């Protein structure tokens, strides 16, 4: 992944997230303004009220901000200073890195919106995905081992897709 990238800015995006056309320019503007790391807002490719509600919360820089669906941009130098992703994590790796980012600098949410697939919600239901995410996030917050996080999430969701 990141070790093979050659640019000065790293941009991590899930395969089911569609970047907007202006994302490169938006990243450049954020970096010029002095932000070392951040993400975009997102919306789902679904018009259901509950998914619109989820999307609305991505404008806030709180405890749950910076998860993979929101993407992540970070300067290469800052990424290297932080030691990159913790390779123990194959789930919640984004939240673990963002947690370290927020200890060192302001985390910036670019006020533009990416589109994310709602497939996981269609296959599992909104409530089931929310409860699985909340459960695994709580385990992560209390320091439960990464392999147990992945196992728990796979059990809770029918397709075992990542958070």
What is the predicted role of each segment?
Residues 77-81, 113:
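Short, well-ordered alpha-helical scaffold segment located
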């Amino acid at each position: 992944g990141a070790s093979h990238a050659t640019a000065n800015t790293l941009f991590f995006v899930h395969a089911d997230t569609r970047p907007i056309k202006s994302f490169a320019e938006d990243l450049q503007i954020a970096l010029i303004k002095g932000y070392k790391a951040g993400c975009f807002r997102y919306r789902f490719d679904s018009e259901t009220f509950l998914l619109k509600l989820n999307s609305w919360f991505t404008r806030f820089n709180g405890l749950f901000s910076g998860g993979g669906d929101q993407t992540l941009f970070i300067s290469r130098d800052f990424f290297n200073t932080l030691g990159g992703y913790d390779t123990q994590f194959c789930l919640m790796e984004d939240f673990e890195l963002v947690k370290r980012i927020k200890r060192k600098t302001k985390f910036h949410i670019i006020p533009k919106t990416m589109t994310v697939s709602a497939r996981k919600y269609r296959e599992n239901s909104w409530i089931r995905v929310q409860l699985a995410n909340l459960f695994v996030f709580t385990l992560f917050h209390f320091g439960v081992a990464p392999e147990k996080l992945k196992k728990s999430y796979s059990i809770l969701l029918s397709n075992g897709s990542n958070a």
